[in-house]
Amino acid sequence: MKNKQLSRLSLPVAIAAILFCGAVMAQDTTSTQASQAPAKKSAAQQKADAAKAKTLEQVVVTGNTATGGLKKIDTSYSVTTASAEQIKMANPKSTADLLKISPGMWPESTGGQTGANIEIAGFPGGGDAPYFSTQLMGSPLYGMPTLSFFETTSIFRLDDTVDRVEILQGGPSVVFGDGQIGATANFMLKTGTDVPSGSVGVTYGNENLRRVDGFFGFPIAESWYGSVGGFWRTSDGVRDPQFAADKGGQLTATLSHDSDNGTMTLYARQLNDRNQFITPVPLLQHGTDQFSAYPGFDPLTDTYYSKAIQHVHLPGYPGGGTDANLANGRGTKFSFFGGNFDYDLGNGWNLSDKFLLDGGDVDTNALFSGNNPGSMNDMLYTNTSSMGAFNLPAGSASASYVNGGGMVDPNQSVIHQGWWYIHKHLKNISNDFRLSKDLFEGNTLTAGLYLTHYTMDDKWALGNQMLMTNTPNAQPIKVSYVDNGQTKYLTDGQGFLDYGGYNIAQHGSATNKAFYLSDVWRIGKWLIDASGRVENENATNNVCNLTNIDLDGNPNTLYDNSVPTCNGTYARTRYDKTHPSWTVGVNYELADNMSVYVRANKGAHFGDFDNALRGNTTGNTPPLQKVQNFEGGFKYQSDLFYADISVYHRQFNGLTYQPTNGQGVPVGAQALYGSDSKGVNLAGAVTPFENFKLQVVANYLDGHYTHNNSCFLFTDLVSGSTQCIGINGKQLQRQPKVRYMLTPSYRVPFDWGDITAFVTYTHVGPHTQDQSALQQLGSYDTWDFGIVANVQKSWQIRLQGTNMTNELGLTESNSRIFGSAAGTDGVILARPMEGREVNLTVKYLF
C-alpha cells in the first residue's frame, strides 16, 4: 500500500520539482543571457501566436513536402491550425473534443475523456474513428486509425507541452504518412530554447477537478536544447460515479539540436491515465426528436456507475477469469519514443526522417447498454422484449439486493446492462523517410518510403449482463426462483445473468509498406502539386474458437450453463492488399492576401484487425473502402475579414454493415453499401473595430447512403418482430446537416495587462443514430464562456465554462439497437452532453 501511495504521488512531485528547479535556473541565467533573443513567451506573446494562427501567413508542415512547410495561403487543401493559447480558448473536454475547431469535424465527446466517436463531414464512419488519425510530431500513433474499443486520441492527452496542432481534412493526406483518406490532427511539441523558460499552473473545477500543469525548456550546450513537462489531475467528473472518474497524468521530454544544415529532435512521453467511459442513461422521447429527463435521473449529471458495481469478478474472461474495476474505465498506460531529423545535403538535396516507437495497454472497463428498463415485477414475470424480461412462473422468484438492503420492491425500475472488460495491448513502430531534390527553379521532387509494423493482443469479456436498479449510482440485484420444487439461480451473487456472450482472445500483426512520389511546381502565382502512393498492407489475425461450456457443472446455476470459452484452437485470417492513391492540387494567389484552389484525390481505407479480419476467412475479407474527393476553396484576409471556405464532393464504395446482438456478438451476413456527399466548410473571423473579434466555424452537409439495393434486417424494439429497411437516400448516421460555432470576444487593455472575455454559441443540427435513420437524435444549442486575465508578464488567470445553460443534447442513443430505440413507454437509452462545468486556472510564466 505504501508503494502504491508513493507511485501515485511520484508524477505530481516530479513535475513540481522540475519546475521549481527550472524557475531557479531561469532566474540565475536571465542576467547572463540578457543579450540573447528572449525565448520566454509572455502572455502577450502567446496571444500574438494565437492571432498568427488565424492568418494566411501561418506555416503548416502537415500534408506537404515543402522544406520548412507552406504558408496557409499557398496550401491547396483545408487545414486548421491552433496555437497553444487557441487550444486553451477552445476549452476542449478531451483531445477529440478539440477537433470541433475544424469545420466539418464532429467529435462525440459525451463518452468522457477517451473513446470518442469522431465523424468527418462526408465520411460515413458511424462509430470509433476509422477516418481519423492522430499524429505526434508528424508520426501516426498507431498503424491503423481505429480498432474495436480503440481510437488514437485515447492515447494522447493535451497539456502545456503541446505547442500547436494542425488539422488536415482530405486532400494530400491520402499520399503522405499513414495515407489517411479522412482527417489527420498533427500535434507539435514545444522544445527547449536559448533562455530557460516555462510555466506552472494549477486548475480547480466544480466537479472537484484538481490539476497541475507545467513545462520547462532550457539550453544544454551550444545548439543543444532540452524540455520537460506534463500534467497530473484527478476529478470526480460531472457524472460522479462515487470514485475518481479521471485520475492520472503524463510526463514528456524533448532533446533537440540545431546545426547550420539541419535540425534533430528526440522526444519521449509516458502516459498513465484512467478515465470514466460514460455510457447511455435513460430519457423520455416525445415524438421523433424531442427528449426530456427520465423520472429520478438527471440526464446531465447522473450515471449508473457506483461503488456497489465497481469491483467484479468475470469468470468468462479468457484464461480462467479475472477481476475488473470500473474505476479503470477507458484507461491508458502507454510509452512513446520518437524523433525527427531534417537535413540540407546541399546542391538542392534535402533529407527528412521521422520515427516513432510506442506501446502499452488501452483497456476498457465499462457498462454497455442493452435492453430498456422496466419494473422488477415486469422484468421477472413478463416476456416484454424491449426490456429483455425473464418470463418466470408467476410468484416463483426472489429478488434481493446484492449488498444487503433486503428484497427489491416489485415496482422498482430495474435494468440489465453489460459489464464489459476489454484488455488491449498494442505495439507500434513506424518510419517515414523522404528525400527531396530541387530539379529546377520552383520545382521540387520528393520520394518517400513509409514503413510501419504493429501488433494487437486482446482479451475480451463482452456480455456479462448485470441486473441492477434503474437509478443513479445503481445497486446490483440477485434473483433466484423455484421451478417444480427446485431452486434455480438466474443470477450469481454479483447480479450477473451470464458470464459473457463473446469471450475471445485474439492476436493481430500487420506491416504496411508505402512508396510515394510528390512533385511541387511554383510558376509565378501558381502552385501545382501532383502526388502518388502505392501501399501494401499484410496482416494476420488469430482469434480463438469458442465452445459453450457449463463452468460449474450445475444445471441450476443458469448464469454459467453456456459460457463461450476459448477451446485451444484458433481461426487464422490473412489479409494482403495493395492499392494506389493519388492527389492533384492547384493553388492560385490572386493577391498577397487572397488565393483560390482546386483539388482531386482518390484513396483507399485498408481493413483493420476487427472490422475486416476477425470473423472472415482468408480470401473472403471485405473489399477495400475507396473514396474519391473533389474540393475547391477560397482564402482571404484583411484587417476586417478572415475567410477560409471550401466546398467538396465525396463518394464512397465498399462500406460494410455487420449487425451485432446486445452482447456484442456479430450475427447475420455482412452487407455492402456506399455514400455520396456534398458540403461546405467555413472558418472565418470579422474584426469591425479594435479589440473586438467575431469568429465562426461552420459546415453544411448533404450526405446520404447509396449502392445498396437490399434491405437491412433488424428486430423492432416495440413489437419484437423482424423487419427490413432500405438505406439508399438516408442521411449519413450521426452527422449533423448543419453545425456552427460563433465566438465573439473583446479585449480590454490595462496598464498592468489585459482581460479578454468571450462566449461561444454552438448549434448542432438534426442528426440520426444509424443507417436506418429511424432513431432521430434532434438538434441542440449550447453556450460556453471564458475570461482570461494577463497580469504583468508572468501571471495568467483563466475562468472558463461549458454548457452554461444545461442544454439537453444527444450525440448517441443505444448502439446495440438498430432502428428506433424507444420502447412503447417512450423510454430510450442515450448519451447526452454533460451538464454545466466551470474551471479556474492560475498560471505562472517564468
Regions found by a protein language model. Give the residues of each.
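Short acidic/polar hinge/loop motifs at secondary-structure boundaries
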Residues: 140-169
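Gram-negative outer-membrane beta-barrel transporters
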Residues: 525, 642, 649-651, 671-771, ...
